[in-house]
Amino acid sequence: MKLILQLCAIALIGSEAFAQSDSLASEKIPFDGMDQTWQNGSDRRDSSVLETKYFKGSVMLDANYTYSFNNPIDNTVVGSTALARNNEMQVSFVSLGGEFNYKNSRAKITTQFGTRSVVVPRNDYSPYRGQYQLNNVYRYLSEAYAGYHFKKWYGINVDFGMFMSYIGLNSYFQCENWEYQASFTSDNTPWFFNGMRVQIFPTKKLKIEPWIINGWQSYGKFNTMPGLGANVTWCPNEKIKLLTNNYYGTDAAGLPNRKRFHSDNSILVRYYNQPKSNRVSKIAFSLTGDFGLEKGGGVNGLKTDSIKGPAQNFISGMFYNRVWFHQNKFAWTIGGGVMTNPGRYLVLYPTGDASPLPNPNNPTTTEGSHPFSANPGDQFKAWDCSSNFSWMPNQSIEFRIEYVHRNSSVPYFAGRGGVTSPTGFTTSPLPSDWKPDLVKTEDRIIFAVLFRL
């Protein structure tokens, strides 16, 4: 009798294990079997050591030291969401969190601490509509959403909350990007959305993802209409990735008749792959082009009109090529981009006494007494180029050194005098004859340590 019970138990366990493996085998996973670790803006790890049945943990740390050859006396960086301080070691981003799943329910929470918890929220004007300081409410979250997974085709995910934007190709997490200081196409477009998305995977190689969101990288809404958009990503094979992001909304505060359209399009190609080689082991490039405009409410998109207003648009592009060496332990990246943005509606505004953003202590006035002009008709053109070298001893850590040159058509970057005060300290009074020192060019070196587990 005892032997029979033992045999029954073995049979039951075996049948359960077979059922589980059969269930896993029958589950359709989008992009399954495709190596996407080489892609600019994607996770370079092939697995996670913090993954369990119900939870996949995440720990990230991004620390940097940067030196601008302009050497501003206030150690302040202007025109970047990756960097905040010159000539100092700073922790830019610390994140703890992970993905939860249980019986098709799903959620993700990713925190953010460090300089980015100030640098990124400052660019959102929507918290000044109404009360409750949304920029403080959300500043320590980079992602926070919950939803449900439907087992249709290769999966359908419906999520509500704050999630990452794909516009501009680059990931918000620097450990996923080829370059540290992103070109204007990426740095001047959204990092996050707050709203609802539906991820539809009709085939193994295709994702269609519509959004209904509060607005263009905004915690709240600027007007009545929500932002509408979608991402389409297609990988015909593991060597090629094509994606397009398109957006429509009203993102000029208090101007509901001013409509914004934006189209962001990228192609990534891995054109050499010898992963076991101790010489060149992989080569790939990414190319991104953006086109957008605002029309109505005193501006006229592509063409200046004496009645409808000046042209207001955004045209940009960026290209990067990356070469990996010695079984992908080392990599060299070179690239850059261009941008034109009449009306300056996507320019990252200078900080300090040059800031045109509302004064947090008195929002009826600008933060700076010499605000950077961002009015309809104001012209802005810029270009940049960069090169970096990375050492990646394993998939969890990367050491990177990067050189960046940036140029603008108007004074924009922090010069030697900085943007704070004659002494560089906020405690010093501002003389009547002093003004922020903005210049047209910037050259800098960046050293970064990027950790991910």
What are these regions (language model features)?
Residues D22, P30-F31, L83, V120, ...:
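Outer-membrane beta-barrel pore domains
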Residues V59-Y67, I109-F113, F160-M164, P210-N214, ...:
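Transmembrane beta-barrel strands of outer-membrane/channel proteins
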Residues Q36, N70-A84, V118-E143, H149-W234, ...:
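Surface-exposed coil loops of outer-membrane beta-barrel proteins
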Residues F18-N71:
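N-terminal periplasmic/intermembrane-space "pro-region" immediately following the signal or transit peptide
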Residues L50-Y54, T66-V91, P422-S428, D433-D437:
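Surface-exposed strand-loop-strand hairpins of Gram-negative outer-membrane beta-barrel proteins
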